[in-house]
């Protein structure tokens, strides 16, 4: 079984942050792609960003990659920044930051490949 990290303190910090898109009141939104979660298992609480309720629903409806593409967001970069701002010292935050940085790079490569696939061929 994967080592899922739970942190009520970090989630409370995320819930106090404004939505990363609208700046309005946000709620904790877990990032499932490229994470340590699984089917019906939320990923670690450090794989989390703040989204307005309506946008959080939209993220689930569209699917994560489509949602993040629509808004030109790399969620792992944002999650990494939130971890550095959080006062949660339950775990080695440097390890979490390193993992999120690696996921951000991987997501960037995936995003570039998707963008390349959607461009029309040159004539």
State what each model feature region is:
Residues 1-25, 43, 49, 53, ...:
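Extended charged
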Residues 25-39:
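Short recognition patches in nucleic-acid-associated and regulatory proteins
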């Amino acid at each position: 079984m994967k080592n899922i990290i739970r942190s009520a303190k970090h989630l409370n910090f995320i819930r106090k942050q404004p939505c990363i898109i609208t700046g309005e009141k946000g709620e904790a939104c877990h990032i499932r792609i490229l994470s340590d979660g699984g089917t019906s298992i939320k990923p670690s609480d450090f794989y989390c960003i703040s989204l307005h309720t309506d946008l959080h629903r939209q993220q689930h409806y569209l699917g994560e990659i489509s949602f993040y593409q629509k808004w030109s967001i790399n969620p792992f970069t944002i999650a990494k920044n939130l971890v550095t701002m959080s006062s949660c010292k339950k775990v080695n935050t440097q390890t979490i930051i390193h993992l999120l940085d690696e996921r951000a790079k991987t997501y960037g490569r995936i995003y570039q490949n998707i963008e390349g696939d959607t461009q029309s061929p040159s004539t």
